Amino acid sequence: MHDSRETFVNHAFVTGYPVKHSRSPLIHGHWLKQFGIRGSYRAHEVTPEAFPDFMRQIKEGRTDFCGGNVTIPHKEAAFRLADRPDELSAELGAANTLWLENGKIRATNTDGRGFVANLDERAKGWDRISAAVILGAGGASRAVIQAIRDRGVKTIHVVNRTPERARELADRFGTAVHAHSMAALPEVVSGAGLFVNTTSLGMDGEPAPAIDFSGLAPDAVVTDIVYVPLKTPLLRQAEEQGFRIVDGLGMLLHQAVPGFEKWFGLRPVVDETLRQIIISDMDRHA
């Protein structure tokens, strides 16, 4: 197998455990068809025990893959096993995008870029803020914190049920990040221009606790990285309280762009056609 920029017909993957639920093949399949590219992108389920060998197979050319995406639970292992992880993935300790270059596996993390690109598209001017509130301190919150910090947000409040987890993120990302327990939520939302839910609250339509957003800045944006359902209970609450909302689907779509460009040589565009393809698939599986 040749490296991605040398191969006429390239094949890419998404791997996780499980991975059959992934909508990434729909996204990349749409772009391959749109560009008329001879290539493929397919789901390839790998257990945690088998993942190191899978990475070796890619590097040694024992698969037809030029690279691919990595999802739960392999992101941290992908970072550790890659030959050349970049600075973004190094700070996060996790990678979601891999590609072969000169016989080495390179790695990056595009989750944060996907997050801010979604806001850029659907809430223009969102970054003219001084403070943001992040609900949750899991792996997903790391990429969000990194991305909004790098866009210039000076104060980032991380609120979590377990304050120790939030403090770990404050230690990781420096003085811009402040850790809080859930009890501090009413205080830290005061004047904030962005509220981000990175937890599973409201996923699959489950009830979410009531949150009073009234302390947010008048033009604040409330967003959720969950996209099933598209309008989560948390987003409904924020909308009813008069705030701009952004669903999480765009993050999924935009984070896919850099990988496609690496593997297939063309930069795709996230548009309404692609968004509707994914929404239709979500409706079919509701």
From Swiss-Prot:
Kindly list the positions annotated as binding shikimate: 22-24, 71, 96, 111, 227
Q: Name one GO molecular function term.
A: shikimate 3-dehydrogenase (NADP+) activity
Q: Mind telling me which GO cellular component terms the entry cites?
A: cytosol
Q: What residues does NADP(+) bind to?
A: 87, 136-140, 160-165, 225, 248
- Active site per UniProt: 75 (proton acceptor)
Q: Known Gene3D superfamilies for this protein? A: Leucine Dehydrogenase, chain A, domain 1, NAD(P)-binding Rossmann-like Domain
Q: What class of enzyme is it?
A: oxidoreductase
Q: What is its EC number?
A: 1.1.1.25
GO BP annotations of the record are: amino acid biosynthetic process; aromatic amino acid family biosynthetic process; chorismate biosynthetic process; shikimate metabolic process
Query: Does the record's keyword annotation contain Oxidoreductase?
Result: yes
State the pathway, as annotated in the record.
Metabolic intermediate biosynthesis; chorismate biosynthesis; chorismate from D-erythrose 4-phosphate and phosphoenolpyruvate: step 4/7
Catalytic reactions on record: shikimate + NADP(+) = 3-dehydroshikimate + NADPH + H(+)
Source species, domain of life: Bacteria
Task: Give the similarity note.
Answer: Belongs to the shikimate dehydrogenase family.
Q: How does it assemble?
A: Homodimer.
Its function? Involved in the biosynthesis of the chorismate, which leads to the biosynthesis of aromatic amino acids. Catalyzes the reversible NADPH linked reduction of 3-dehydroshikimate (DHSA) to yield shikimate (SA).
Name used for this protein in its record: Shikimate dehydrogenase (NADP(+))
